[in-house]
């Protein structure tokens, strides 16, 4: 364990889809400084998304230096670095030169759809579900790796000879920070590759063979909270470096940042869409409702399991009101207009603009508004749009609770939309469960910092961290069971009528 008596800070590196950030935190988990750099989004053709790994590295290393400078501290005062990252995004690089052989293929990229269809034709769906907890989809890293090896001449043979390395973004950053000494990932990121057996905690031989991916190129998989190596800062040597001591994929880091480390604890990140995770403890629960089974962080960063569900349209629904319908000038205005009316006047808005995600999984569903009468005003539509976010969250959480056999104790929330008090209260009313909004908004970074701090003894354990997980406001349910059932029944009827709309197109 690292000696941290004279070290008063932890740095979290938050490498996201559109920007790289560095956050300095003190012993009380207060944010001391934040530095952020956006980087280029590359769209070679429709449905393809790439990043330049060297630009990711340049922006991330720059934010680290800037955040320390802003805080007015020296790197020798930092006890550890924790890393959280966009998941699934795939980097393959030359072991000798440290240069990527191709741009990073981003999690959003759909170029490997044909490879996924091949896997389905080869009857691998059940094997993927059973071993990895995932579904066959271009979203995950496995088919992205195969695509690069298929399209960069000689790369597969070089990978077999140990000349090329694969990593998700965490692996790439650690390789660069340790000057090529360390090639690792953690269990949460490995679990999103569609190559990792989440039960045996090892790379799956059958999937590697099916995709012709050489095992030699894969990183060592470690826990989410331990010292992996040391970041060499400003040309210094390894002995002078900062311990890199925490890794978690962004959603799992947020779950840990919320201190959702016990079975039945869950969080929802309200962004463009929503990401819901519920801790299921030592039990890997197989979903009967289209949810993913994934690895989360246990109380000390060890392996725990979680159910994960994604909602496609949440904040994007409010953006639609603003940009296309011109009903509001600013997303923040939605709360004001929603509270000008007592209810939605019987209106339900189903925001299936790109189909419906969990638990319906209907790509042919389309957006619809139901219950329109002459008495419906713009305010009612705005309210119905906000309510749709809460209804969709309830659908996923109901599925999670049925799958896990666990009743949600409280829902921890983060993301841009949580500042909307109306939405948070309506969410609590629909769930019949308290909704807890944290005081610290940097929950994902907090999770990475906690993992690094635990590994180095900077923080003593969960009890100390729980004292720091301050809740700014608890939204208690204030709705009768009869009213809740009536609202939910109307929503379910609306969803049913929006389904399979585009099936014949």
Swiss-Prot record:
Its EC number is 2.7.1.30. The keyword DNA-binding does not apply. InterPro entries: ATPase_NBD, Carb_kinase_FGGY, Carb_kinase_FGGY_CS, FGGY_C, FGGY_N, Glycerol_kin. The keyword Nucleotide-binding applies. One of its GO terms (molecular function) is ATP binding. Inhibited by fructose 1,6-bisphosphate (FBP). Glycerol binds at residues 87-88, 139, 250-251. Pathway: Polyol metabolism; glycerol degradation via glycerol kinase pathway; sn-glycerol 3-phosphate from glycerol: step 1/1. GO terms for biological process: glycerol catabolic process; glycerol metabolic process; glycerol-3-phosphate metabolic process. Key enzyme in the regulation of glycerol uptake and metabolism. Catalyzes the phosphorylation of glycerol to yield sn-glycerol 3-phosphate. This is Glycerol kinase. It comes from Azotobacter vinelandii (strain DJ / ATCC BAA-1303). The lineage of its organism: Bacteria, Pseudomonadati, Pseudomonadota, Gammaproteobacteria, Pseudomonadales. The gene is glpK.
């Amino acid at each position: 364990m690292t000696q941290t008596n004279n070290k008063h800070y932890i740095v979290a590196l938050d490498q996201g889809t559109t920007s790289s950030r560095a956050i300095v935190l003190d012993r009380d988990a207060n944010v001391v400084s934040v530095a952020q750099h956006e980087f280029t989004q590359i769209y070679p053709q429709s449905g393809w998304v790439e990043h330049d790994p060297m630009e990711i590295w340049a922006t991330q290393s720059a934010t680290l230096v800037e955040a320390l400078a802003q805080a007015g501290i020296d790197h020798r005062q930092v006890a550890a670095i924790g890393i959280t990252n966009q998941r699934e995004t795939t980097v393959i690089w030359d072991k000798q030169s440290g240069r990527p052989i191709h741009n990073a293929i981003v999690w959003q990229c759909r170029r490997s759809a044909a490879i996924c269809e091949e896997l389905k034709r080869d009857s691998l769906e059940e094997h993927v579900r059973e071993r990895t907890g995932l579904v066959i989809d271009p979203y995950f890293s496995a088919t992205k790796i195969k695509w690069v090896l298929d399209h960069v001449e000689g790369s597969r043979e070089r990978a077999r000879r140990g000349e090329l390395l694969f990593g998700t973004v965490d692996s790439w950053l650690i390789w660069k920070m340790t000057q090529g000494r360390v090639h690792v990932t953690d269990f949460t990121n490995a679990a999103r590759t569609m190559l990792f057996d989440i039960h045996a905690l090892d790379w799956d031989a059958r999937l590697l063979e099916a995709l012709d991916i050489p095992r030699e190129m894969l990183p060592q998989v470690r826990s989410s909270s331990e010292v992996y190596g040391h970041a060499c800062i400003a040309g210094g040597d390894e002995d002078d470096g900062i311990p890199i001591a925490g890794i978690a994929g962004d959603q799992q880091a947020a779950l840990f940042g919320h201190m959702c480390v016990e079975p039945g604890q869950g969080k929802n990140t309200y962004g463009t869409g929503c990401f819901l995770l519920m801790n299921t403890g030592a039990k890997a629960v197989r979903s009967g409702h289209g949810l993913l089974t994934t690895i989360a962080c246990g109380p000390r960063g060890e392996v725990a399991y979680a159910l994960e569900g994604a909602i496609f349209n949440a904040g994007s629904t409010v953006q639609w009101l603003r940009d296309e319908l011109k009903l509001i000038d600013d997303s923040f205005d939605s709360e004001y207009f929603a509270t000008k009316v007592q209810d939605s006047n019987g209106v339900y808005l189903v925001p299936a603009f790109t189909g419906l995600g969990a638990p319906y999984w209907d790509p042919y569903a389309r957006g619809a508004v139901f219950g329109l009468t002459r008495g419906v005003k713009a305010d009612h539509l705005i309210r119905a749009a906000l309510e749709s976010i809460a209804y969709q969250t309830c659908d996923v959480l109901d599925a999670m609770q049925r799958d896990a056999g666990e009743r949600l104790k409280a829902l921890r929330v983060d993301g841009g939309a949580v500042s909307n008090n109306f939405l948070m209260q309506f969410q609590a009313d629909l769930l019949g469960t308290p909704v807890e909004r944290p005081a610290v908004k940097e929950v994902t970074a907090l999770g990475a910092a906690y993992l690094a701090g635990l590994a180095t003894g900077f923080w003593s354990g969960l009890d100390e961290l729980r004292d720091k997980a301050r809740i700014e406001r608890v939204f208690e349910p204030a709705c009768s069971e009869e009213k809740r059932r009536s609202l939910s029944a109307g929503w379910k009827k609306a969803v049913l009528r929006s389904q399979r709309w585009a099936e014949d197109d």
